[in-house]
Amino acid sequence: MLSPKRTRFRKQHRGRMKGISSGGNHICFGKYALQALEPAWITSRQIEAGRRAMTRNARRGGKIWVRIFPDKPVTVRPAETRMGSGKGSPEYWVAVVKPGRILYEMGGVTKKIARRAISIAASKMPIRTQFISSEIEEKSKTTRKES
């Protein structure tokens, strides 16, 4: 499971997930990618489950890049605890994902294999996602420049 080696503070505020992703929304490393369409917290377990599903499905071929990292601690209070007496202890880590963010990238495989592997990883995610390829991204860039 992914988690930071050390953090400045043990606990964090929950924060808000408004707007679209400002960074990490273009394909950088691979040729195919999985893009988030909704805002959500994605746990380190979910990230790992998606990564495993992709590697199993790709079978040696290709390379996978995980583009999100769980850097936010989520605190949970013990069961049957009365109100008050401070905030709970950090239980697990999440990555804050906004719409447009690339979750996984894949390269070195055919489009058919990539689509199948990424769709299996998408089923492990708690949000709606879409499969994108670098060719589609290039086309959208050129159409934006023309207009």
UniProtKB/Swiss-Prot annotation:
Biological processes annotated in GO: mitochondrial translation
Transmembrane annotation, as ranges: none
InterPro entries xrefs: Ribosomal_uL16, Ribosomal_uL16_bact-type, Ribosomal_uL16_CS, Ribosomal_uL16_dom, Ribosomal_uL16_sf
Biased composition (Basic residues): 1-17
Gene Ontology molecular-function annotations: rRNA binding; structural constituent of ribosome
Residue runs in coiled coils: none
Main localization category: plastid
Location in the cell: Plastid, Chloroplast
Keywords: Chloroplast, Plastid, Ribonucleoprotein, Ribosomal protein
Any one GO CC term of the record: mitochondrial large ribosomal subunit
Region (Disordered) location: 1-20
PANTHER family: 50S/60S RIBOSOMAL PROTEIN L16, LARGE RIBOSOMAL SUBUNIT PROTEIN UL16M
Subunit and partners: Part of the 50S ribosomal subunit.
UniProt record similarity statement: Belongs to the universal ribosomal protein uL16 family.
Protein name per the record: Large ribosomal subunit protein uL16c
UniProt lineage: Eukaryota, Viridiplantae, Streptophyta, Embryophyta, Tracheophyta
